C-alpha cells in the first residue's frame, strides 16, 4: 500500500465516540464511561490511529504507581482487523515507548492479554515484553477468562542516579 499515511491524533470530546466504537469492535470486553472520561485526561497517552484519514485503531494508557514503581499501563492498544499488519500497532506502541523514554522515570510498561491472543503476545514480544504472570479469571464473561501480564522493563537513563554515592570528607 504505497503512499498510504498512518497518523496519530489526539482523543478529544469531539471524537471520543469514535474511540468507543473502535473499542467495541476490536475488543471482546466493554469499557465503562469512567474509562472514556479518564482517557480524556491522559493527553499524549491516548491516541487515535488514522490510516489515510480513517480512524482504524487506538491506544489508551495510564500512569500507575504500584509495587513502589512508576509504571505505564497499556489499557488498550488495538486496530481494526482489515488494517492489521500495516505498521499501525507498531506506530502506536512506539509512540508510547517514546513517551516513556523521554520521561525517563518509568520503571516498566505492562498490559494484560487474553491467553488465547497469540498474535498480540507475539507482537509485544518483538518489542521486548515478557510474560511475567498469568491471572486466572481476569476477564468476566469471555473465554478463555485468563490473562497473561506482559511487561517490558525500562532502564534508568545513564547518568541518572550516577552521582548518588555519599562521600565522607
UniProtKB/Swiss-Prot annotation:
GO terms for biological process: establishment of mitotic sister chromatid cohesion; mitotic sister chromatid cohesion; mitotic sister chromatid cohesion, centromeric; N-terminal protein amino acid acetylation; post-translational protein modification. It comes from Homo sapiens. The keyword Cytoplasm applies. The modification N6-acetyllysine is found at residues 34, 37, 140. GO terms for cellular component: cytoplasm; cytosol; extracellular exosome; NatA complex; nucleolus; nucleus. The modification Phosphothreonine is found at residue 12. Substrate binds at residues 31, 75, 138-141. Changing residue 84 to A: Strongly decreased N-alpha-acetyltransferase activity. It is found in: Cytoplasm; Nucleus. CoA binds at residues 117-126. Changing residue 28 to A: Strongly decreased N-alpha-acetyltransferase activity. This is N-alpha-acetyltransferase 50. The lineage of its organism: Eukaryota, Metazoa, Chordata, Craniata, Vertebrata. Gene3D superfamilies: 3.40.630.30. InterPro entries: Acyl_CoA_acyltransferase, GNAT_dom, N-term/lysine_N-AcTrnsfr. Changing residue 73 to A/F: Abolishes N-alpha-acetyltransferase activity.
Amino acid at each position: 500500500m504505497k503512499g498510504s499515511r498512518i497518523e496519530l491524533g489526539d482523543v478529544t470530546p469531539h471524537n471520543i465516540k469514535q474511540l468507543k466504537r473502535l473499542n467495541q469492535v476490536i475488543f471482546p470486553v466493554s469499557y465503562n464511561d469512567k474509562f472514556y472520561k479518564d482517557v480524556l485526561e491522559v493527553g499524549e497517552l491516548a491516541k487515535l490511529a488514522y490510516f489515510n484519514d480513517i480512524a482504524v485503531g487506538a491506544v489508551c494508557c495510564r500512569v500507575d504507581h504500584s509495587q513502589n514503581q512508576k509504571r505505564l499501563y497499556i489499557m488498550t492498544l488495538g486496530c481494526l482487523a482489515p488494517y492489521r499488519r500495516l505498521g499501525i500497532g507498531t506506530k502506536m506502541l512506539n509512540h508510547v515507548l517514546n513517551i516513556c523514554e523521554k520521561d525517563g522515570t518509568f520503571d516498566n510498561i505492562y498490559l494484560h492479554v487474553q491467553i488465547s491472543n497469540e498474535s498480540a503476545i507475539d507482537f509485544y514480544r518483538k518489542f521486548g515484553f515478557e510474560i511475567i504472570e498469568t491471572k486466572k479469571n481476569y476477564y468476566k464473561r469471555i473465554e478463555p477468562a485468563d490473562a497473561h501480564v506482559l511487561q517490558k522493563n525500562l532502564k534508568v537513563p545513564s547518568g541518572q542516579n550516577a552521582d548518588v554515592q555519599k562521600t565522607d570528607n
